[in-house]
Design a protein with these regions (language model features):
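ABC-family P-loop ATPase nucleotide-binding domain
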Residues: 1-12, 303-307
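ABC transporter nucleotide-binding domains
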Residues: 3-6, 13-189, 194-208, 214
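Short coil/loop linkers at secondary-structure junctions
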Residues: 68, 109, 124, 249-250, ...
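Non-catalytic alpha-helical coupling and interface elements of nucleotide-dependent molecular machines
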Residues: 104-107, 302-306
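ABC transporter nucleotide-binding domain
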Residues: 173-263
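Short, charged/small-residue-rich alpha-helical element at the C-terminal edge
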Residues: 227-300, 307
Length: 307
């Protein structure tokens, strides 16, 4: 049986009386792009910092491709690339020179590797400019390039697209997805961009208050037990409060003057249609709609700041 790319076993971190991470256990499957989500202060960054030992766990175990960090730290991290928060560089040197310095430390990077990396992260035209002239988004690109330079098997990224415009975000996530599909790279990525996580990630883990609250394949966790039915009316629209009085209807949200999103406790849009017709409402369109990752995230964390 193949070992997971990353395994956290009963991981805890306490800062005095603050329990930042509480008994967190998860396994990141190899060869996937995996999202790591949670509200602000949920423990995401603390967890990511513990993997390369930038922060030491209070208790628990971390294994990378089956290697326990406590037993062989260097071997475990040999196959890992990391970018957490805002990456730091030698600002007075060029982007290319910064990658060359990183390549010397890694010891297994060719000039061609640097050329290809600069091209794929979209900095080929600015590679000879000093980093101090780069925007935040460009520095994020360079940080990702440095993290993948040594051809790691596991890449750990904390908010990697901060400061990037939508086009740049798609370009970088597409680059990472290409590496996953073609090179077998595993990417463990923390991000507040839920739409992009839904589009690019295979699996997601959601933590809240330092604990794991949901996990699974994106398709599976968005296949809800309750269904959202978008319903358009010809004429009078029912009062949401009146609809919510029926226990089979869990939530009602007005989307447009003639349209409601109705959340059912069970997958039964046919019942809803009949129920509305019997109540005297004319339905012009009705269609079940799957939850988005944003809606799923809000339903289990209640956090609207990160939506």
């Amino acid at each position: 049986m193949t070992a997971p790319a990353l395994a956290l076993d009963d991981l805890c971190k306490r800062f005095g009386r603050i329990h930042a991470v509480e008994h967190l256990s998860l396994e990141v499957p190899s060869g996937q792009m995996v999202g790591f989500l949670g509200p602000n202060g949920a423990g995401k960054s603390t967890t990511l910092y513990m993997i390369p030992r930038l922060v030491h766990p209070s208790s628990g175990r971390i294994r990378i491709f089956g290697v326990d960090l406590r037993r062989d730290f260097k071997l475990a991290l040999r196959s890992v690339g990391v970018m957490v928060e805002a990456p730091a560089f030698y600002e007075y040197l060029s982007g290319r020179k910064n990658l060359q310095l990183a390549a010397r430390l890694l010891g297994r990077v060719t000039r061609r590797d640097i050329d290809e990396t600069l091209d794929r992260i979209g900095l080929a035209d600015r590679q000879h400019d000093k980093v101090r002239t780069y925007s935040q988004g460009m520095k994020q690109r360079l940080g990702i390039g440095r993290a993948v330079l040594g051809k790691p098997r596991l890449l750990i990224l904390d908010e990697p697209t901060n400061g990037m415009d939508p086009e740049g975000t798609r370009e970088i996530l597409g680059f990472l997805q290409h590496r996953v599909r073609n090179d077998g790279l595993t990417v463990f990525i923390s991000s507040h961009l839920l739409h992009e996580v839904e589009e690019y990630c295979d699996t997601v883990f959601v933590i809240n208050k330092g604990r794991l609250v949901a996990s699974g394949h994106v398709r599976d966790i968005l296949r809800p037990h309750e269904r959202i039915v978008r319903t358009t009316f010809a004429g009078e629209v029912p009062d949401p409060e009146t609809l919510r009085a029926d226990e089979r209807i869990k939530h009602v949200e007005s989307i447009a003057p003639d349209t409601l999103d109705i959340v059912l406790a069970a997958d039964d849009s046919a019942w809803l249609n009949q129920h509305l017709l019997q109540a005297g409402f004319r339905v012009s369109a009705i269609s079940p709609r799957q939850k988005t990752l944003k809606e799923f995230f809000l339903s289990i964390t209640g956090d609207h700041r990160n939506a």
